[in-house]
Amino acid sequence: MAFILTSTAFSQSKDEQIIRTLIEEQRLAWNTGDKEKFMQTYWQNDSLMFIGKSGVTYGWQKTLDNYKKGYPDTAAMGKLDFDLLEVKRLSVMYFFVVGKWHLTRTIGDVGGHFTLLFKKVKNKWVIVADHSS
């Protein structure tokens, strides 16, 4: 019984570390101006949900298109920082992440909060819902 509990605890901490690493990889991709690489953490599916100041967007490509429109160049993109406030396992298949985002830009800094829902799809953790404000 102790082995099973230890194995489960190890698996959970490993999954949490994977989630944290994926978010860090997003930050690094953004900071090099690579929106496509930034989007690799998102579920490449028409059911991806992104909620922002303009409302709800469904779909990976539409979300990428919105990022390209809203952040057309590296000056608009700036340098991204995240402050993860909570990374919580909801089940074997889901993680919930709450944090702050901040863009340091020559055209003026911006920032806000986000919630992410990660789901394990085909043995890979992906963001299936993002609410950023």
Segments and roles (model prediction):
Residues Q26, F38-M39, S47-L48, T63, ...:
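Hydrophobic pocket/interface hotspot
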Residues N45-Y58, P72-A75:
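A short gly/proline-enriched turn/hairpin at secondary-structure junctions
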Residues Q44, L90-S91, V121:
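Structural motif
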Residues S54, E86, G99-W101, L116, ...:
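A mature extracytoplasmic/lumenal domain signature
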Residues L64-I107:
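Surface-exposed, charged secondary-structure patches
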Residues G111-S133:
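Short beta-strand edge/turn micro-motifs at domain boundaries
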Residues I4-T41:
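Short, low-complexity N-terminal intrinsically disordered segments enriched in polar/charged residues
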